[in-house]
Amino acid sequence: MTTTLFTNVHIATGMPGSTAAETTPLQDILVEDGRFKKIGQRLVAKLATQGMDISSIETIDLEGKLACPPFCDTHLHLDYVFTARKPGAVNESGTLFEGIQRWSETKSDLTVDEVKERAKIGIAKEMRHGVQFIRSHADVTDPNLTSLKALLELKEELKDTVTLQIVSFPQEGMYSYEGPHGESGADLVEEGLKMGADCVGGIPHFEQCREFGERSMHTVVELASKYNKLIDVHCDETDDPNSRYLELLSALAYRAGIGSKTTASHTCSLGSADNAYFFHLSKLLKAAHINFACAPTENLYLQGRQDTFPKRRGITRVKELTEAGVNVSLGQDSMQDPWYPVGNGNMMLILDYVLHLAQMMSFEEIDDALKFLTVNGATTLGMRDSYGLEAGKPANFIVLDASSVFDAVYERCDVLRSVREGRTLFTRNTSITTDLDLLTL
């Protein structure tokens, strides 16, 4: 039996068993065989009185820092990472649609090994920022299914250090794409599910006509029901307020009884829709338990390109959805690809952006903000039952360089330690050396 005792740590707010940031007492965490055994105050003394030989246990002092569950990135494209400077891939207009065009024109030379090598670098960057759970889309509008094969291999190879969910995603459309042998995007999505993808993807706003987009939403729900898969659709990623595939997706998922297994990603058009429409739609979204994945940095960059001024922010209604009781999580989306020239997997930066863009900056909202990266993400991924700092669950957690959630958020603090099933994946030292008293404050 492997036992580790982590001492002197604050537990982040918004997590099971936690209280307000300012009053959370220091606690200790006992891990046995990769699972949380006990979490509580003055645990060292209690265990000693129960006859446990503390001196024989590996003990790690967390020095009053903040612990929370590992971060979740619920929207990423690992097969695209670090292709932004590839010949022919440069996106001159900075629009979503040119990004799709550039990718489609330059992806024919992909190999499984090359995709895996790039994706591993992207995963490593995310993990160094405290991410242990990633949902990545894999483009299947490729008769060779190269991206999907690569990411499925990585999912298995890295399962002990990071959890990957893979979306069978038709980047060029379910019914607008036709392969060299007459196969449709829908055919390839289904083939991806048979190969082991976790989620059904879609992109209705990119289809050639409204009818194709609507048909694709029916297909998504039918495939998810047929193969017992999750759903994650790139939905209404446009400034057009009349793009309303979210409404159809939500209604179909609700009627099929799989709303809680469904994620609508981006939904930028919801930020352009009027309040009367949102008021009507929010009732359906809440009843269906639809999840949302927002990629604030990328949507800010790609959207509003046809606007002069006023210029739209491009993101979905994060604040209003949250206030309506709808689950919203966050994603990096891209790392240096034809859609977005930067991105380094730092989810604290993604959180910072969404709080600013959604104007969620009250003290109460900031104190509650880590939920977007943690429990909300786990809800989107369908992993709540095995996620969180609770006895009996896998001992997965990170330690932040702060003592409260507020400090962590406003400092965009570093991750000092990442623990996976009781095993420390990495530690980081953020101390500085100085002779100036001022710089020690």
Language model features by range: what are they?
Residues 391-441:
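C-terminal cap of metal-dependent C-N hydrolases
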Residues 230, 251-262, 298-302, 312-400:
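His/Asp/Glu-enriched, well-ordered alpha-helical/loop segment
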Residues 146-157, 178-291, 307-330, 387:
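Histidine/acidic residue-rich metal-binding segments in metalloenzymes
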Residues 1-54, 405:
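N-terminal metal-binding scaffold of metallo-dependent hydrolase/deaminase domains
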Residues 102-118, 165-183, 204-211:
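Active-site mouth loops of central-metabolism enzymes
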